[in-house]
A protein has these predicted regions:
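Short, highly selective alpha-helical patches that border small-molecule cofactor pockets
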Residues: 100-104, 108, 215, 269, ...
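Short alpha-helices
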Residues: 190-192, 196-228, 257-258, 265-273, ...
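Active-site phosphate/pyrophosphate-binding segments
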Residues: 210-214, 225-323
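Extended redox/cofactor-interaction regions of prokaryotic respiratory oxidoreductases
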Residues: 108-171, 177, 274-378, 387-392
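N-terminal export/assembly segments and adjacent metallocofactor-ligating motifs
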Residues: 1-211, 216-221, 233, 258, ...
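Short, surface-exposed amphipathic charged segments that create phosphate/polyanion-binding patches used
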Residues: 130-135, 218-223, 301-309, 382, ...
Length: 438
């Protein structure tokens, strides 16, 4: 016999779907099937059962091979690394629970570390823009029930957030949107004809890197002022037409992704997008929201914010929190050789950072805490496997709209495998002993 666990939270992307049903074996140790999830979310649950999964810490040997060690040895190595380091980097935090993040920040305070999350290479520019000009936002529930004008700017949720459109933005029938897709107008701004663009009523194929110009043109068009014949590759007539469509809606939302945050102008793009949203509020109700990637990258910013006052790249090396993107961000620190140890949890910089940064990680004392074998685990001196948050252990996570949701445990982790929080708590305790002895 099997049993079904309902209302399960999906720990994949920032949409944090909360309607999954997971069928588990009678003994509660094996996942049999997953319902309501997208292909990627379902695979996250099934991958926890994968054969050959690493269940014990591995230490890199002088010849490059890995030798299995105990969790006690892993805790000792990690604590000693922090105790000896003058300026360690603690990076990641986006694929773990808020409880684990909180313990990690205690370690950072003791060790005088820099704490940075994956926003540093994706939506960090968004956070800078919000600090500049504020943000008129809302929840995804409001979007589902009220929004009749949807803009996807520089993002492709069909692939990056597969259930976003069916649960919240385009297709669902909401309280005031009882015809679903037919009740809405969808605008996509993207240089490429993506699968999201194919669903749009209007697709602006903007020239690469010229989003700032088009955002400014929309602000001009809202006031019926003059525009050049072509802006960023878009005829002015099309811009005026879209501006009227946006003004005529009852409630609108701009969803934006890394096509805006990591192209030319960076945070200034977001400044302009937020100001466009504020301008639209002179005519109708409009909000704006970042399409956050990892399922708890938003939570990492929240926990850092309420503990230290800044959402990412927090430098605690002087005994108090400092924040200066460009100086205290991970890649800048690694490339300049300013850190002497690296601790990675809930992220994979080995796959996504520039090779110059990855080489530095490989040369330094380093620890990677991850359930998977990843490019980062293969260049780190120590790999510590842990339980999957949202599958084998519960914990608090924040959805992309800053709504906290409790992930739930579905099955038990493999015997003897620690959770992120348990491992960090043991490291924190041992580090306290070492620092006290010093």
């Amino acid at each position: 016999m099997t049993k079904t666990v309902s209302d399960v939270i999906c720990p994949f992307c920032g949409t944090l779907c909360d309607d999954l049903e997971v069928v588990v074996s009678d003994d509660g140790k094996t996942i049999v099937d997953v319902y309501n999830a997208c292909a990627i979310g379902a695979e996250k649950f099934m991958h926890a059962q994968a054969k050959g999964r690493v269940t014990r810490p591995r230490m890199q040997q002088p010849d490059g091979s890995y030798k299995e060690v105990s969790y006690d040895e892993a805790v000792e190595y990690t604590a000693q690394m922090f105790a000896k380091s003058k300026k360690p980097l603690m990076y990641g935090w986006s694929s773990t629970s808020c409880e684990a993040q909180s313990v990690g920040h205690e370690i950072a305070e003791k060790a005088g570390a820099i704490v940075d999350n994956t926003a540093t290479v994706c939506h960090g520019t968004t956070l800078i823009a919000v600090q500049d000009v504020g943000i008129p936002s809302c929840t995804l529930g409001e979007v589902k029930n009220r929004a009749d004008r949807i803009i996807f700017w520089g993002c492709n949720p069909t692939h990056a957030h597969p259930r976003h459109q069916s649960r919240y933005s385009i297709f669902p029938r909401g309280f005031f949107m009882n015809k679903g897709h037919k009740s809405r107008k969808v605008v996509v701004v993207d240089p490429r004809v993506t699968d999201t663009a194919k669903m749009a009523d209007i697709h602006f194929q903007v020239e690469q890197g010229r989003d700032y110009e088009l955002l400014s043109a929309f602000r001009v068009a809202l006031r019926n002022e003059k525009l050049p014949d072509v802006v960023a590759g878009i005829p002015k007539e099309k811009i005026y037409e879209a501006a009227e469509i946006l003004k005529s809606g009852r409630f609108g939302i701009i969803f934006f992704g890394m096509g805006v945050t990591q192209t030319l102008s960076k945070n200034h793009n977001i400044d302009e997008a937020i100001m466009l949203t504020k301008d639209l509020n002179e005519f109708t109700k409009f909000s704006i929201m970042a399409m956050r990637g990892h399922y708890n990258v938003t939570g990492s910013g929240q926990v850092l914010g309420w503990q230290f006052g800044y959402p990412f790249c927090v430098d605690l090396s002087r005994g108090f929190a400092r924040y200066n993107p460009g100086e205290t961000t991970s890649n800048d620190l690694l490339v300049r050789g300013e850190v002497d140890a690296v601790f990675v949890l809930g992220s994979d910089p080995g796959a996504h950072f520039p090779i110059s940064s990855v080489k530095k990680i490989a040369q330094l004392p380093s620890v990677c805490v991850d359930p998977h074998i990843t490019p980062t685990s293969e260049v780190s001196k120590l790999h510590v496997p842990v339980a999957f948050v949202g599958v084998e252990v519960g914990g608090n996570c924040y959805r992309m709209d800053n709504v906290p949701i409790d992930a739930r445990k579905v099955v038990d982790p493999p015997e003897g495998v620690l959770t992120d929080q348990e491992f960090l708590t043991r490291v924190n305790k041992r580090l306290g002993e070492l620092m006290g002895a010093a």
